[in-house]
Amino acid sequence: MLSPKRTRFRKQHRGRMKGISYRGNRICFGRYALQALEPAWITSRQIEAGRRAMTRNVRRGGKIWVRIFPDKPVTVRPTETRMGSGKGSPEYWVAVVKPGRILYEMGGVAENIARKAISIAASKMPIRTQFIISG
Protein backbone atom coordinates (compact mmCIF):
# COMPACT_ATOMS: atom_id res chain seq x y z
CA MET A 1 0.00 0.00 0.00
CA LEU A 2 1.22 3.50 -0.81
CA SER A 3 1.77 6.04 1.97
CA PRO A 4 4.25 8.85 2.67
CA LYS A 5 7.43 7.94 4.58
CA ARG A 6 7.00 10.99 6.79
CA THR A 7 4.90 14.18 6.81
CA ARG A 8 5.31 17.52 8.54
CA PHE A 9 1.98 17.18 10.35
CA ARG A 10 0.13 14.04 11.44
CA LYS A 11 -3.39 15.35 10.78
CA GLN A 12 -4.93 17.51 8.03
CA HIS A 13 -8.14 19.41 7.42
CA ARG A 14 -10.57 17.73 5.06
CA GLY A 15 -10.55 20.58 2.55
CA ARG A 16 -12.78 20.68 -0.52
CA MET A 17 -12.42 19.61 -4.14
CA LYS A 18 -13.36 22.60 -6.27
CA GLY A 19 -12.78 22.97 -9.99
CA ILE A 20 -10.75 20.83 -12.37
CA SER A 21 -7.23 19.45 -12.27
CA TYR A 22 -4.65 21.64 -13.99
CA ARG A 23 -1.73 19.46 -12.94
CA GLY A 24 -1.32 15.84 -13.99
CA ASN A 25 -3.98 16.04 -16.70
CA ARG A 26 -1.79 15.15 -19.71
CA ILE A 27 -0.27 11.81 -20.72
CA CYS A 28 3.46 11.98 -19.94
CA PHE A 29 4.92 8.48 -19.86
CA GLY A 30 2.78 5.88 -21.66
CA ARG A 31 0.48 5.80 -24.66
CA TYR A 32 -2.83 4.96 -22.97
CA ALA A 33 -4.29 6.38 -19.78
CA LEU A 34 -7.21 6.36 -17.36
CA GLN A 35 -8.59 9.85 -16.65
CA ALA A 36 -10.90 10.85 -13.79
CA LEU A 37 -14.19 12.57 -14.68
CA GLU A 38 -15.39 13.28 -11.12
CA PRO A 39 -13.80 14.62 -7.93
CA ALA A 40 -13.11 12.11 -5.16
CA TRP A 41 -10.76 10.83 -2.50
CA ILE A 42 -9.10 7.65 -3.75
CA THR A 43 -7.66 5.46 -1.01
CA SER A 44 -4.30 3.72 -1.19
CA ARG A 45 -6.16 0.37 -1.20
CA GLN A 46 -8.16 1.37 -4.28
CA ILE A 47 -5.01 2.57 -6.07
CA GLU A 48 -3.28 -0.72 -5.28
CA ALA A 49 -6.30 -2.80 -6.38
CA GLY A 50 -6.37 -0.99 -9.73
CA ARG A 51 -2.62 -1.39 -10.21
CA ARG A 52 -2.77 -5.13 -9.45
CA ALA A 53 -5.70 -5.67 -11.82
CA MET A 54 -3.83 -3.92 -14.65
CA THR A 55 -0.57 -5.79 -13.97
CA ARG A 56 -2.35 -9.17 -14.01
CA ASN A 57 -4.00 -8.37 -17.33
CA VAL A 58 -0.98 -6.95 -19.15
CA ARG A 59 1.49 -9.64 -17.99
CA ARG A 60 4.99 -9.06 -19.43
CA GLY A 61 5.85 -6.48 -22.05
CA GLY A 62 3.63 -3.70 -20.79
CA LYS A 63 4.68 -0.92 -18.43
CA ILE A 64 2.34 0.78 -15.96
CA TRP A 65 2.73 4.17 -14.28
CA VAL A 66 0.64 5.19 -11.27
CA ARG A 67 0.20 8.97 -11.54
CA ILE A 68 -1.46 9.64 -8.18
CA PHE A 69 -0.07 9.28 -4.66
CA PRO A 70 -2.05 9.15 -1.39
CA ASP A 71 -0.55 11.94 0.71
CA LYS A 72 -3.58 13.03 2.77
CA PRO A 73 -4.24 11.30 6.11
CA VAL A 74 -7.88 10.58 6.97
CA THR A 75 -8.65 10.42 10.67
CA VAL A 76 -11.34 8.20 12.16
CA ARG A 77 -12.71 8.31 15.70
CA PRO A 78 -13.12 5.02 17.58
CA THR A 79 -16.68 3.63 17.48
CA GLU A 80 -19.06 4.49 20.33
CA THR A 81 -16.93 7.45 21.44
CA ARG A 82 -18.52 10.60 22.83
CA MET A 83 -17.99 13.92 21.10
CA GLY A 84 -15.03 16.05 22.12
CA SER A 85 -11.56 15.01 23.32
CA GLY A 86 -9.83 16.00 20.09
CA LYS A 87 -9.53 14.74 16.54
CA GLY A 88 -9.36 11.02 15.80
CA SER A 89 -6.17 9.17 14.90
CA PRO A 90 -4.99 8.81 11.26
CA GLU A 91 -6.50 5.60 9.87
CA TYR A 92 -5.70 5.53 6.14
CA TRP A 93 -4.28 7.65 3.31
CA VAL A 94 -6.07 9.15 0.31
CA ALA A 95 -5.15 10.91 -2.92
CA VAL A 96 -7.29 13.96 -3.70
CA VAL A 97 -8.40 13.58 -7.33
CA LYS A 98 -10.14 16.29 -9.34
CA PRO A 99 -11.79 15.90 -12.76
CA GLY A 100 -9.23 15.63 -15.57
CA ARG A 101 -6.52 13.99 -13.47
CA ILE A 102 -4.65 11.02 -15.00
CA LEU A 103 -4.77 8.05 -12.61
CA TYR A 104 -2.80 5.39 -14.49
CA GLU A 105 -0.75 5.27 -17.68
CA MET A 106 0.24 2.28 -19.76
CA GLY A 107 2.61 1.61 -22.65
CA GLY A 108 4.23 -1.21 -24.59
CA VAL A 109 1.00 -3.11 -25.31
CA ALA A 110 -1.63 -3.27 -28.06
CA GLU A 111 -4.65 -0.98 -27.75
CA ASN A 112 -7.20 -3.78 -27.21
CA ILE A 113 -5.15 -5.23 -24.32
CA ALA A 114 -4.70 -1.75 -22.80
CA ARG A 115 -8.44 -1.03 -23.11
CA LYS A 116 -9.33 -4.30 -21.36
CA ALA A 117 -6.79 -3.82 -18.55
CA ILE A 118 -7.72 -0.18 -17.96
CA SER A 119 -11.47 -0.98 -17.94
CA ILE A 120 -10.86 -3.56 -15.19
CA ALA A 121 -8.85 -0.98 -13.20
CA ALA A 122 -11.65 1.57 -13.80
CA SER A 123 -14.19 -0.78 -12.20
CA LYS A 124 -12.10 -0.70 -8.99
CA MET A 125 -12.32 3.11 -8.82
CA PRO A 126 -15.14 4.88 -6.92
CA ILE A 127 -15.60 7.44 -9.74
CA ARG A 128 -16.49 7.66 -13.43
CA THR A 129 -13.39 7.57 -15.63
CA GLN A 130 -12.47 7.53 -19.31
CA PHE A 131 -9.86 5.76 -21.43
CA ILE A 132 -7.65 8.16 -23.40
CA ILE A 133 -4.91 7.74 -26.00
CA SER A 134 -1.98 10.15 -26.38
CA GLY A 135 -1.51 12.07 -29.60
From Swiss-Prot:
Q: Where in the cell is it found?
A: Plastid, Chloroplast
What superkingdom heads the lineage? Eukaryota
Task: List the Gene3D superfamilies.
Answer: Ribosomal protein L10e/L16
Pfam families xref list: Ribosomal_L16 (PF00252)
Query: Among the entry's GO cellular component annotations, what is one?
Result: chloroplast
MF annotations from Gene Ontology: rRNA binding; structural constituent of ribosome
Q: Keyword check for Plastid, yes or no.
A: yes
- List, alphabetically, the SUPFAM superfamilies matched: Ribosomal protein L16p/L10e (SSF54686)
Quaternary arrangement and interactors, per the entry? Part of the 50S ribosomal subunit.
Q: Which family does it belong to?
A: Belongs to the universal ribosomal protein uL16 family.
Designated name of the protein: Large ribosomal subunit protein uL16c
Organism classification: Eukaryota, Viridiplantae, Streptophyta, Embryophyta, Tracheophyta
